[in-house]
Amino acid sequence: MKQNIKRNWIWILIVMIVIGIILYFSIRNLFSTKVAEWSISELLNNIERAKENTTDALYFKEITVNPFTNSITGVFNNTDNTSTSFVTYTNLDLLRLSGVASDQGVISKIFTPEVFLTANNVSGSLKSVATPQPNPFLGILISSVPVLILIFVMVWIYRSQVKMMNGQGGAFGGDKGTAQIIKSDKKFTDIAGNKEPIEEISEVVDYLKNPGKYQQSGARMPHGILLGGPPGTGKTLLAKATAGEANVPFYFVSASSFVELFVGMGAKRVRQVISEARKNSPAIIFIDELDAIGRTRGSGIGGGHDEREQTLNQLLVEMDGMKENSGLLFIAATNRTDVLDPALIRPGRFDRIITVGLPDVKEREEILKLHAKGKRFESNVDFANIAKRTPGFSGAQLENVINEAVLLSIREDTKVINLYQIDEAIDRVMSGPAKKSRTITKEELTMVAYHEAGHAVVGIKVPGGNKVQKITIIPRGNAGGYNLMMPENEKYNYSKADLYATIASFMGGRAAEEIIYGDNKISTGAADDIKKATSIARRMVTQFGMSDLGPIEYQSDEGSPFLGKALASNSSLSNQVNHEIELEIRKIIFTAKEQATKIIKQNIELLELIKESLLKKETIVGEEIEYIAKHMKLPPEKIEEKDLSKNSEDNNLDSLIEKTSKKE
C-alpha cells in the first residue's frame, strides 16, 4: 500500500511540473514584447532615417547577427525616444558581419546596400526572404498539450478510484483487504482472572489443534464466539492470547473498517476477508467492536438501505449461508451485546456468548500481582488489601494503578514503590490528580469538610451502608473534595434495606450541610450524590419492584440503538403512572434523607471530630475514622504509615495506637 501511495505521488508531481512549465511559457509569450518583422530594405531605410536625425550613431539598444539562421534580431532606437524589437531574415551570407555587429560605431558603415552587395558578391537590388512559417500541425499539437494533460489526469484519477473500489489501492488510499494476520506472543497463562472465558476459548483452540478427537464423538466446532462485557475487562487480550495459543492463521479486523465512503465496499470487504481465510483454513477471524456493523437492522434513520446494514447482511450470509465454513472460527468482541441484531447472535453464527465481567476481589489480587511482576515494592505492600480497596475496577484500570504508582515512584525518586504511591495512584485513576495549588477559602474548605464528614457518619451508623474508606478535602478533578465509599462486602444481590442504606449514605453530605448551615446555605457539592441516589431510587421503583407500585417493570429497554433512549423512547405509560413513579422516587429519597439527617443530629460530636481531623490532616483513611468513632477523639498524629495502611478487618488499630503512644 505504501509503495502504491509513493508511486501515485510521483505521478502527481510529474504532472504538476509539466503543467507548470506549460503555464510559464504561455504566460511569458502572452506578456512578451511584440516583435516587428522587417525586410532588409525596411531595416536599411530605418537606419538611413536614423542617420539624418541622430548624431551619436547609436541606432540599436542591442543587435544580434546570426549567420547560421541568416537572421538579424535586435531592438532599434526610434527618433521619438521609443524602441522597436525587430527580426530580419535574408539569403545573404552574414558570417562576415557577425564579428563587428556589436561595434555600433561602424554600424552606419556596415548596414548600407553597397556593403551588403559587395560583401556577398551579389549584383542587383537587395531581396528579402519570407519569414519562416511554423508547421501548422505542430502548432495544433502544442496547443492541444494542456487539454491532453487534463484528460490524462482525469483518466488516471478515475482508474485509481476503480482500483480502490476493487481493493487494489488507489489515489485516495485503500488497501487490498482490511484483515491483518496477527502473530501474538501472548498465552492464556499471561492472563489473570477470567477463568471461565479462558476455559471456553481453550476448548475451541483445542478443537482446531486436534479436530479428530471431537469428530469421533460427532461434535462440531462452534461457528462463532462472542465476547461481551464492560470496557477494559480483557476481551481483546483474550483474542491476542487465542492467537498465541492457536497454531492457525489469526485474522484481526476492526468492524468499523468494513464501512467506508463508497457504497458496497463493506460487503465486498467482508467477502474478501472471509474468502482469504477459507483458503487458509483452519483459521480464526477476530472482529473487534462488532457493534459498529452488528446493530439491529431497520432501526436507523436510513431504514434498511444504508451501507452498514448491507455489510451486516453480507456477514450473516458468509457466517451461516449456503457455503460451508468448515475449519473457520469467528471471534468477536463488543461492549454492547444488547444492541446486536438477533440474527447475528443466534446459534449457527455466534454459538457461544461469553460475558467477560469485572473481576472480583480474588481476581483483582491476581491481576495486580501479574502487573507487579518485574517491579520493586516495599515489603509491607499487601495486594489483597489493595484489591479490597478497588471494587468495580476493571483489569485495565488495575494495570493503570500499578503504572501510575511506578510513575510516582520515578517522580519522587524512590527506589521502591510504597503504599502512599499506590494509594495516590488509586485516587488518580478514580478521580484524577489532586489540585493542591487551587486556592480555596477557609469557609469553603470547612463546608467541604462537613460535607465529607456527613458521608462518614451515616456510613458508620447505618447498617448495610457504604463505609467511607478514605476522605480528602484536597480537590480532585471537578470535585472540591473526594471520598471513597465501599460496601463492607462485595455483593451481587442487594436487599431493599441495603439500597435504602446506600441512598442514605449518599445523602449524608447534603444533610450535614443543612444541619450546620441551614437550608439557605447549602452548596452544589451534593450534585453527584443526588444524581447517584436518584438513579438507585428510580431503578428500585421501575425495575426492582421495591415500592408501593408493586413488582411491575415500568421501564422498557427497547429503545433504538441509533437514536438513543431519549429520542426513540415510545413509552406506553400514561401520564398518571409516570406521575406516580416520580412520587415514589421522591418518597424513597426523602425517607433516606430524613434517616441521614436524624443520624447526623444524634452524632453531631462525631461529625465535628471527623471535620476537625480533615481540616488538620486534609486526608484521613478508614482506620482513622473507625478510631474516632470508637474513642470519640482524634487519633495521634505520629502513626507509622505502614501500620496505618494495614488491613483493618481485625480492628487492630487500637493496639497500634497504644504501641505508638508507648514509643512516644
From Swiss-Prot:
The residues responsible for catalysis, as annotated, are: E452
CDD domains attached here? RecA-like_FtsH
Show the ranges annotated as biased composition (Basic and acidic residues): 639-649
Which terms does the UniProt entry file under GO BP? Answer: protein catabolic process; proteolysis
Q: In this UniProt entry, which residues form the Cytoplasmic topological domain(s)?
A: 1-9, 158-664
Where do the segments described as Disordered lie? 639-664
Q: Which residues cross the membrane?
A: 10-30, 137-157
Task: Keyword check for Protease, yes or no.
Answer: yes
Q: Could you tell me which InterPro entries the record lists for this protein?
A: AAA+_ATPase, AAA_lid_3, ATPase_AAA_core, FtsH, P-loop_NTPase, Peptidase_M41, Peptidase_M41-like
Is Zinc among the key words of this record? yes
EC number(s) on file? 3.4.24.-
Q: In which residues is Zn(2+) bound?
A: H451, H455, D529
Question: Which top class of enzyme applies to this chain?
Answer: hydrolase
* Main location class: membrane
Annotated localization? Cell membrane
Q: Which residues lie on this side of the membrane: Extracellular?
A: 31-136
Q: Name one GO molecular function term.
A: ATP hydrolysis activity
Q: How does it sit in the membrane?
A: Multi-pass membrane protein
What GO CC terms are in its UniProt record? Answer: plasma membrane
Task: Report keywords, A-Z.
Answer: ATP-binding, Cell membrane, Hydrolase, Membrane, Metal-binding, Metalloprotease, Nucleotide-binding, Protease, Transmembrane, Transmembrane helix, Zinc
Which NCBIfam families would you find in this protein's record?
Answer: FtsH_fam (TIGR01241)
Its assembly, as annotated, is: Homohexamer.
| Function (record text) | Acts as a processive, ATP-dependent zinc metallopeptidase for both cytoplasmic and membrane proteins. Plays a role in the quality control of integral membrane proteins.
Assigned protein family = In the central section; belongs to the AAA ATPase family.
Q: What is this protein called?
A: ATP-dependent zinc metalloprotease FtsH
> Which source organism does the UniProt entry give?
Mycoplasmopsis synoviae (strain 53) (Mycoplasma synoviae)
Source species taxonomy = Bacteria, Bacillati, Mycoplasmatota, Mycoplasmoidales, Metamycoplasmataceae
Task: Name the gene for this chain.
Answer: ftsH
